[in-house]
Amino acid sequence: MEMDYDLVMEDEFDALCLDVRRHHDSTSKTKYPAKLHARKVVRELGVDDGLIYLPGQPEISLEDSDQPRLFRQRRYFFYITGANFEDCTATYEVKHDKLTLWIPYVEPRQVLWFGSKPSAAECKRRYDVDEVRYTTQLSGFLRSFAAQPSPPVTYILHPKQAPDLGHGSQSQLCLDSSLLLPAMDRARVVKSDYEVAMVRRANNISSAAHRRVAERILRLTNEREIEAIIQAVCIASGSRSQAYPIIAGSGANGATLHYGSNNASLGGKQCVVIDAGCEWNCYASDITRTLPLSGAWTPKAAAIHAIVQRMQDECIAKVGPGAAWREIHLHAASVGMEGLLGLGILKGRREDVARAGTVAAFFPHGLGHHVGLDVHDVSGTLALSAAEGRGQQLDFGKRAMVTPSMLADMTRVSSSQDAVGGGQSKTQLLLPNMIVTVEPGIYFCREYLEGYFRSDPAHADFIDWDLLEEYYDVGGVRIEDCILVTEDGYENLTVAPKGDELLDVINKGKK
């Protein structure tokens, strides 16, 4: 069942009142398409026989403790089962198109302590698999498979995930750990319609959380209150897991790309960067908004926000089948450079600044990444974007550092390919049902700028250091949405308010 909610704050932040309403969820009666995914993997493997062996995540205790680690299912296992509980395994017999889910047997005394896991009958009803068996029978099945005359290849992700047959029988299996991972990555990069629905739902919940923060931001006093509201809204909607650690960085903290302390006072700050997205049924969302803490932008923050908003708007408009991500990233960098030149933060001849790649001092990360079972999801065989000649993939958004020299190399390669009519063979072209983030940002990190650029003759003269002092208090501005590539363009899956709507939501919260 899908859940809507009203989150009402009482006495500023003393209590939360949840009004929950249930209505029909169109995906609630639809099984996760495990067999569809398994067949996609086999097509990418290009084989007509063999066994795919994928263990799920076992229950693991914290170091030197009897308490379990927070459970997170292995994503490759989940992709071909949809099963989200501990100590399972999946096998797929390619020749017979047979997908088997192996589950742990739960003794009655275990139910007393920890509760039950789904039974074999329940799993058969719940999951799109051909058979459900207990893991106590798995080693016998594998020994029988290995005992065949010339047994087919068993495909595993990693050598450390080789199956344990017991009785020293492992050597009888013909194991391959080189082909399955890239095949599954190629299968995962283009989402099934069910997967799109999961990412959409995660975005809807996360967007509601961002909206609720905006409604309350004028009453909040500390970054941790932002984190608490986001978690409360997501949990109330049925999502207990965040896809990544919440970022709530105010003032100068917003210039740290992966700020995580979330405990600073909001007082006296111009902006707060909020980067937060929950998971729904193991599928991620990824959303960033930058909010003015007074309800109105300061002139400096307004100027930077306008540049970043233009970067995002124009880049989203370029998303569609056949688009090259590197070119979209370069467009974002160009818009950012023009904006900073217009403000005077960057100075000099436009051609010289572009050739040096100095704008990367302020926009130092990749434009975006795939989203799916992982927030920084797999890209398949080809990188979403790359700095050719440097072996640097830019598939992981703000986890992918883009230096000025890398940006300059990307620009040079792009220009040379345009001149000779070259293709994009080394990087990925967007395809329908890919989901990517578009997350440009401009940051004023004093330590980074002064530590690397002030003394570098290749860049120092292109930055007005006196004027820059006036912008350090802005911190950073980033705006991020999840974008679905469609047959004829794109769809923005993120419905969190931004632009003028965001300001309206913030200021209505005064009442």
Curated annotation (Swiss-Prot):
Transmembrane segments: none annotated. One of its GO terms (biological process) is proteolysis. It catalyses: Release of any N-terminal amino acid, including proline, that is linked to proline, even from a dipeptide or tripeptide. CDD domains: Prolidase. Its EC number is 3.4.11.9. The keyword Disulfide bond does not apply. The keyword 4Fe-4S does not apply. Mn(2+) 1 binds at residues 286, 439, 480. Its cofactor is Mn(2+). Belongs to the peptidase M24B family. This is Probable Xaa-Pro aminopeptidase MAA_08947. It comes from Metarhizium robertsii (strain ARSEF 23 / ATCC MYA-3075). The lineage of its organism: Eukaryota, Fungi, Dikarya, Ascomycota, Pezizomycotina.
